Amino acid sequence: MRPKFTFSEEVRVVRAIRNDGTVAGFAPGALLVRRGSTGFVRDWGVFLQDQIIYQIHFPETDRIIGCREQELIPITQPWLAGNLQYRDSVTCQMALAVNGDVVVSAGQRGRVEATDRGELGDSYTVDFSGRWFRVPVQAIALIEEREE
């Protein structure tokens, strides 16, 4: 098993990194690093004899977080990022209707459950009060999570 990334190499996180309970001072499930964030490899080690874990320093937040190899790409690799990601809290920007009946009001809060990049652009599956709807990116806005 050889590491894919070298010391001091700049890398990008391809998915949100949330606390699995191993980072003190953060609740389990708390957002630690947003996908698309960049950082630098400080060290690496092996977990369960079959996974390389990289110690990544994220200068923007001055955090050092452990990331699995499959969660990282080289900074030189093209990055196609959507605006939102799984579990993001959002607010609906306009009323959404099904067969003329409003089912989601403007301002209603929801949570992203899935993302999709199609020919018509980004769309998201959002849970609004227990009902899931596929909505275009223009219909929702991110509610920023407070990172502690």
Curated annotation (Swiss-Prot):
GO terms for molecular function: nitrogenase activity. One of its GO terms (biological process) is nitrogen fixation. The keyword Transmembrane helix does not apply. Keywords: Nitrogen fixation. It holds the Pfam family NifZ. The keyword Amino-acid biosynthesis does not apply. Belongs to the NifZ family. This is Protein NifZ. The lineage of its organism: Bacteria, Pseudomonadati, Pseudomonadota, Gammaproteobacteria, Enterobacterales.
